[in-house]
Amino acid sequence: WVDFPEALSEGGIRWKLLNVSPEMGAWTAIFDCPAGSSFASHVHIGPGEYFMTKGRMEVRGGEDDGGDTAVAPGYGYEPCQAYHEKTFFPENSEFYMTFLGPLNFTGPNGETVALVTWADAQAAWEASI
């Protein structure tokens, strides 16, 4: 496990890159998310599939605020252009996800902070191990 970049998350999220597929523009990782941690605002440029292995994940504010809450064990799908202002983990959580295409982390005015492709994920992983 290595730390996920703090510029793109809060609360000590860790990750492991499991696979990259340059021919598909895809990358797969598993994430360890402590209680109270979150990912910064982002847009799924391409679709993604995940499986929660432990805990809970609140997307778009969670069910109580009109969003979704994923509970382990459980499968989820993110369509193209899905926007998440904040993805929050109210308890210790872990999930496996495949991203088909880039993940666009955005700032407060919608500007791109980081566009994470399979190559960027691979470079970040290799630099951290």
PLM region spans:
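A short, N-terminal "cap"/entry segment at the start of jelly-roll beta-barrel domains
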Residues: 1-25, 67, 111-129
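Conserved hydrophobic/aromatic beta-strand scaffold that supports enzyme active sites
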Residues: 15-17, 28-32, 49, 67, ...
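Short acidic-glycine-tyrosine-enriched beta hairpin
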Residues: 22, 57-89
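Short, charged/polar surface micro-motifs in flexible loops or helix N-caps
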Residues: 23-25, 35-37, 56, 82, ...
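"Short basic amphipathic alpha-helical interaction patches in structured regions
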Residues: 32, 44, 65-74, 111-113
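Glycine- and acidic-residue-biased ligand/ion/polar-headgroup-sensing regions
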Residues: 34-35, 44-63
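Histidine-centered active-site/metal-ligand motif
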Residues: 42-44, 84-85
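A short hydrophobic beta-strand segment most commonly corresponding to one strand
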Residues: 49, 77, 90-107
